[in-house]
Swiss-Prot record:
It catalyses: AMP + diphosphate = 5-phospho-alpha-D-ribose 1-diphosphate + adenine. One of its GO terms (cellular component) is cytoplasm. Pathway: Purine metabolism; AMP biosynthesis via salvage pathway; AMP from adenine: step 1/1. The keyword Metal-binding does not apply. HAMAP family: Aden_phosphoribosyltr. Catalyzes a salvage reaction resulting in the formation of AMP, that is energically less costly than de novo synthesis. This is Adenine phosphoribosyltransferase. Its main location: cytoplasm. Keywords: Cytoplasm, Glycosyltransferase, Purine salvage, Transferase. Belongs to the purine/pyrimidine phosphoribosyltransferase family. It holds the Pfam family Pribosyltran. The gene is apt. It is found in: Cytoplasm.
Amino acid sequence: MELKDYIRNIQDYPKKGILFRDITTLLQNKDAFKYAIDKMAEQISSEKIDYIVGAESRGFLIGSALAYKLNCGFIPVRKKGKLPYKTISEEYALEYGTDTLYMHEDAIKKGERVLIVDDLIATGGTALAMIKMVEKLEGIVVGSSFLIELKELNGRKEIEKYPVNVLIEY
């Protein structure tokens, strides 16, 4: 199955000059969605994983489905004010400025094995922020998995010390 056939390309979104890779069309197709999750699971099937950590919002969609497939827990990473309990945070760079991600401070215990998951890796900033939070809690990052990689933005370089798995490259 050619997964690129299920990704909609939207020119000039969210701003002029950007070609947005829209995964909603893949998610809508039950066969393509199942195939993508199955293939992502195959890429890391040899790893023992306690948790998948995924950032809102599309990371929740891919990460929770993958956690179900791998029979492990899912830990949501959110923006400020969205988690009800005490949190840790990590700032990361955006194209113009910075943002901050948050995770519950008791989400991971020392030595627990974690896979970082998101729908897409571009600059690597979101993935690196999630990795740093896992390591603050003394978890072990076993790698990362992404549905899509935008290769020209070289985000893989930010997290090259960890295994990176990708299904679709642009």
